[in-house]
């Protein structure tokens, strides 16, 4: 197989719940999002939720949008846990966040394993992204905020 083997070492909540899993890799060019890209799974993924304590609030909250998106599209249990643990999530309680990240990653991995190249069921993961990408690029807002607006 051609390409470069890589690992995903995710240090933001957004990366942990979204970009770390799925194998969609892209590069923006000017105002065009993900114009160059490929599908390739990382050799392994590390999601160290302790790192999330170092993030500025704006970056952390951006990741929460992707976490909520995952709950909305596929996991009533995840949604309930987010709803019932809002205070601990805001406080970045590591045990709660670790559980939520794990649930989100497992959900996404299950979807991707059925449709790696995004020809059918995987498209559900794009919820919020259709308008979100346009908002993100033209209004210069963080990805998570744009996805939240797109939802």
How should these model regions be labeled?
Residues 1-85:
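A glycine/threonine-rich phosphate-anchoring loop and its flanking beta-alpha core
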Residues 81-151:
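Active-site segments that bind and position negatively charged phosphate/pyrophosphate groups
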């Amino acid at each position: 197989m051609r390409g470069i083997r890589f690992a995903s070492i995710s240090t933001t909540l957004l990366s942990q719940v979204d970009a770390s899993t799925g194998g969609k890799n892209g590069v923006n060019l000017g105002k065009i999002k993900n114009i160059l890209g490929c599908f390739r799974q990382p050799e392994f993924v590390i999601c160290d939720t302790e790192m999330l304590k170092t993030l500025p609030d704006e970056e952390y909250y951006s990741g929460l949008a992707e976490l909520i998106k995952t709950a909305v599209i596929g996991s009533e249990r995840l949604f309930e846990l987010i709803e019932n643990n809002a205070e601990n999530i805001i406080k970045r309680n590591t045990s709660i966040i670790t559980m939520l990240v794990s649930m989100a990653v497992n959900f996404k991995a299950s979807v991707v394993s059925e449709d790696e190249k995004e020809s059918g069921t995987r498209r559900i993961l794009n919820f919020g992204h259709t308008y979100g990408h346009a908002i993100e690029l033209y209004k210069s807002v963080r990805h998570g905020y744009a996805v939240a607006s797109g939802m």
